[in-house]
From Swiss-Prot:
Native species: Myxococcus xanthus
Enzyme active site: 142
Gene Ontology MF, one: ATP binding
Name the UniProt record assigns to this protein: Serine/threonine-protein kinase pkn3
Xref: Pfam families: Pkinase
């Protein structure tokens, strides 16, 4: 004899309005079917509770809770509940919109690695759905890749739907019925549980943000932040262990430093150290992506370009590969050498001359000579010879001018800059004093940047001002801007830049450079710049006490 828990529903009509077409999944609580709503000829999903559970008051209440929680939500990225009712045989069902896609777990299994831009698009939509849910007083409590559906839409190849509010918590006083949780009661999926959830403590919306941090970690690395063979093992690690940085788990993955910092902040044990809300989390995530796109669109020097003059000679000898920039931009997954980072700092090793307008005019003249091709006939060959000679003389003159300007002339030695670089300034001008958590006599590179003072978007804007100053050879202003940006973000790539600025000034400040490079290495232990830094400082890079 067949029981109601078999797939006997397929081909039948439930509640006189849903014709069941196929079984598409099942779990401990029931089965999930694809069905067609007859009155609208619309495909829907039916979740049917098992008959054997109808006598369990808590399970029935949980099933009703899912319908109630999801029905409160009205957001494009949240699954919509269409109906709740009882079948002819007494089984309870929920009718929901049908999503023709795959869940995020399937995407991870089939398509990893995912590029950072795609991850940002997907997770931003998840955070939008959570922001709406949290505003409606609903905490998901079981967010994981299997509960995130992704389907292609006309204007979005990865359109997200967050589903399965089966253990959602409704936080207002209008909720009635039997309590689904009690002190010390733990529900959820252990791999994605926040520490407070694993402890059985009272939860708020920041518990969901921790789960988003776990998902982000997994999307960027293909791995969970913690590994265990048991639910208890996962819960213990969420409670007691710090997650290893994503780039340490996957040194080959393309993970920007800003993305790594955001992931680790979302995984903070203390909810107060995580992003304050889903909306704030989304804003920080999109700021990370904005900077990534800016770096991706930055002009790169072509190794094959022969139609323009080569840049002025460097002050120090360049490596044989110095004219070829790594296709990977600085700061991505620690894949770039220090030399590539130096090349990303225009003006430090190749500063403009004092009379930049004259140099631009000279380059325009020489460019026109380079682009002039020899014509037919003997006289054109002679003309081409003299034009080539002219180019060589111009380049030599420019080189001599640059050497004279930057190294000084005669026996006077190196000329000092007409301004002083800021050194060990505790807080740069324009920065917020609350941005650093130490006494004023502690150098900026040894300070902890407290979470309450972080402003990633402002830091990116200030760092761009520093880049522009560096392009104008205004090294002093560049250093000031980089320091201010660092005080707002703690970005280890800014520490690397500041080390370069102080090391390559005319009168190098090696102690200041050492301080900034130590900070970079402390934040990025696997940095590919380590070998070159230690070589420059003769192996004297000491690891300072963590701030």
């Amino acid at each position: 004899m067949r029981t109601p828990d078999t797939d006997e529903y397929v081909g039948k009509t439930i509640a006189y309005k849903y014709r069941v077409e196929a079984l598409i999944g099942e779990g401990g609580m029931g089965k999930v079917f694809r069905a067609r709503q007859l009155s609208l000829d619309k495909v829907v999903v039916l979740k049917v509770l098992r008959h054997t559970l109808l006598s369990d008051e808590r399970t029935v209440a949980r099933f009703q809770r899912e319908a109630k929680a999801a029905s409160r939500l009205n957001h494009p990225n949240s699954i919509s509940v269409l109906d709740f009712g009882q079948a002819e045989d007494g089984a309870l069902f929920i009718a929901m919109e049908y999503v023709a896609g795959q869940d995020l777990h399937q995407i991870l299994s089939r398509e990893w690695p995912l590029n950072e831009g795609r991850v940002v698009r997907i997770v931003s939509q998840v955070l939008s759905a959570l922001s709406d849910a949290h505003g409606a007083g609903v905490i998901h409590r079981d967010l994981k890749p299997e509960n995130i559906m992704v389907e292609p839409r006309r204007n979005e190849p990865d359109f997200v739907k967050v589903l399965d509010f089966g253990i959602a918590k409704i936080t207002d006083s209008t909720d009635d019925g039997p309590a689904l949780t009690r002190a010390g009661f733990v529900c959820g999926t252990p791999e994605y549980m926040s520490p407070e959830q694993a402890r059985g403590s009272q939860l708020d919306h920041r518990s969901d943000l921790y789960a988003v941090g776990v998902i982000l970690y997994q999307l960027m690395t293909g791995l969970l932040p913690f590994e265990s063979d048991s639910a208890v093992g996962f819960a213990t690690k969420h409670l007691t262990e710090e997650p290893p940085p994503p780039t340490r788990r996957r040194p080959d993955a393309r993970i920007s430093p800003a993305m790594e910092r955001l992931i680790l902040r979302a995984l903070s044990k203390n909810p107060a150290d995580r992003p304050a809300s889903a909306e704030a989390f989304k804003a920080e995530l999109q700021a990370v992506d904005k900077e990534r796109r800016r770096m991706d669109s930055a002009p790169r020097r072509s190794a094959n370009s022969s139609a323009v003059l080569a840049p002025l000679p460097r002050k120090s000898a360049a490596s044989p590969q110095s004219d070829v920039r790594d296709a990977t931009l600085p700061g991505w997954g620690n894949e770039v050498t220090m030399e590539a980072t130096v090349r990303a700092l225009p003006g430090v090793l190749e500063p403009l001359p004092a009379n930049a307008d004259a140099m631009a005019a000279t380059r325009e003249t020489t460019d026109s000579l380079v682009h002039t091709q020899p014509g037919a006939g003997g006289s054109s060959g002679v003309a081409f010879f003299f034009k080539s000679l002219t180019i060589l003389l111009v380049v030599a003159a420019l080189g001599f001018f640059a050497y004279y300007f930057f190294m000084g002339a005669g026996s006077g030695g190196a000329q000092d800059l007409p301004y002083a670089l800021p050194t060990n300034a505790p807080v740069p001008a324009g920065a917020n004093n609350s941005a650093v958590g130490a006494s004023p006599d502690v150098p900026l590179y040894d300070r902890a940047i407290v979470s309450g003072a972080r402003n990633v978007e402002r830091a990116l804007d200030v760092a761009r001002e520093g880049d522009k100053a560096l392009q104008r050879a205004d090294v002093g202003l560049a250093a000031t801007k980089y320091r201010e940006a660092f005080s707002r973000s703690g970005d280890p790539e800014l520490a690397l830049k500041l080390g370069e600025v102080y090391w390559h000034r005319q009168n190098p400040d090696k102690e200041e450079a050492r301080g900034w490079w130590n900070r970079h290495l402390r934040e990025q232990p696997a940095s590919k710049a380590r070998a070159l830094i230690e070589q420059r400082l003769n192996g004297a890079v000491a690891q300072p006490t963590s701030p």
